[in-house]
């Protein structure tokens, strides 16, 4: 599929569908735990199909899991029944550790499962693009060096950080290449940790590396979609745009209207209904009100697509998800009616 044309189609669509990061809640219809899900390519592919069957979204998305890449490098990963796996400890502490760090082979850890998930999803889903997920270079390096430590090390030991980033980027390029060969139409590259950096440091320690990934792998048939759910990402917009990405997904605490106004008109901006306060909130009515508010604010920008501010957790109340989709559909339907009489 020509994904540049896909972007244009989304921009020109006056009746835009909702496009939340929705995959993990498939466990509710498959009666499996999150741990069982993320360790089975068949379960994950089936979950993607079931979500696609239930909701009209412009693409099918796989599972955001920021532990996979670091685990492949040898970091300790903790699995719990109903939580997304997490990395603990600090694999790289010194320059010597960074120098000794080996770039994993493709297929290490759970990367083979993630790639096979995409391959199986292409057998099940034929009516929309399929998007894989991976961590960005700085977010991967942060899990290898410890999230808090790496922020300090960008000042005190930048050479060590760059050593780890070089190896993380080399592996991520191989990993995304595996998704591409498996049939994915793009990948959502999650780089939230970079949102904690200053603009100059973000450029040096994240965006330049993401640009390398984009230059190597993005083409008309494969998109790199940039995800950063950190606070205040509007201040980092020049650094985000420098990555070469054309689709940006931002979090609940971003000024999404400022971001929409700041990107070229042929770039898509997705976001940013709060997961923690709205999707995981107390009532479907609150979901409806928050969704309507964001639609009224941004729906007249053609390159805006309403989404969740981050990936939606497995235990979300599906009534809330249903209300979100219905509210978006109703909002664009009413706009169409207004267009007919104005």
Model-assigned labels for residue ranges:
Residues 45-63, 178-182, 242:
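Catalytic domains of carbohydrate-active enzymes, especially glycoside hydrolases
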Residues 76-81, 87-90, 142-151:
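Short, flexible, mixed-charge acidic loops at enzyme active sites
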Residues 23-28, 65-69:
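Short active-site-proximal "capping" loops at secondary-structure junctions
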Residues 32-40:
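Surface-exposed strand-loop-strand hairpins of Gram-negative outer-membrane beta-barrel proteins
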């Amino acid at each position: 599929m020509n994904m540049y044309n896909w972007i244009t189609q989304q921009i020109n669509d006056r009746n835009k569908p909702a496009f939340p990061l929705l995959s993990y809640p498939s466990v509710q219809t498959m009666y499996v735990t999150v741990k069982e899900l993320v360790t089975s390519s068949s379960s994950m592919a089936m979950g993607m199909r079931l979500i696609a069957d239930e909701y009209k979204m412009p693409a099918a998305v796989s599972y955001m899991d920021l532990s996979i890449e670091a685990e492949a490098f040898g970091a300790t990963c903790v699995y719990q029944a109903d939580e997304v796996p997490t990395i603990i400890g600090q694999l790289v502490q010194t320059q010597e550790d960074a120098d000794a760090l080996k770039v994993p082979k493709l297929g290490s850890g759970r990367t083979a499962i993630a790639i096979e998930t995409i391959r199986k999803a292409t057998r099940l889903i034929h009516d929309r693009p399929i998007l894989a997920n991976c961590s960005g270079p700085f977010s991967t390096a942060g899990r290898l060096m410890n999230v808090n430590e790496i922020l300090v090390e960008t000042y005190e030991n930048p050479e060590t950080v760059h050593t780890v980033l070089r190896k993380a980027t080399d592996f991520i390029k191989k990993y995304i290449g595996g998704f591409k060969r498996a049939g994915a139409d793009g990948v959502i590259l999650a780089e939230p940790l970079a949102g904690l950096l200053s603009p100059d440091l973000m450029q040096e320690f994240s965006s330049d590396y993401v640009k390398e990934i984009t230059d190597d792998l993005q083409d008309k048939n494969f998109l790199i979609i940039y995800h950063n759910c950190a606070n205040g990402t509007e201040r980092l917009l020049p650094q985000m745009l420098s990555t070469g990405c054309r689709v940006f997904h931002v979090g609940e605490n971003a000024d999404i209207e400022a971001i929409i106004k700041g990107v070229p008109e042929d770039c898509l901006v997705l976001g940013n209904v709060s997961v923690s306060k709205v999707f995981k909130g107390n009532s479907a009515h609150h979901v409806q009100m928050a969704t309507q508010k964001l639609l009224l604010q941004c729906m007249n920008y053609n390159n805006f697509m309403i989404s969740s501010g981050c990936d939606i957790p497995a235990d979300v109340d599906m009534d809330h998800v249903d209300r979100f989709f219905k509210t978006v559909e109703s909002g664009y339907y009413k706009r169409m009616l207004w267009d007919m009489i104005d």
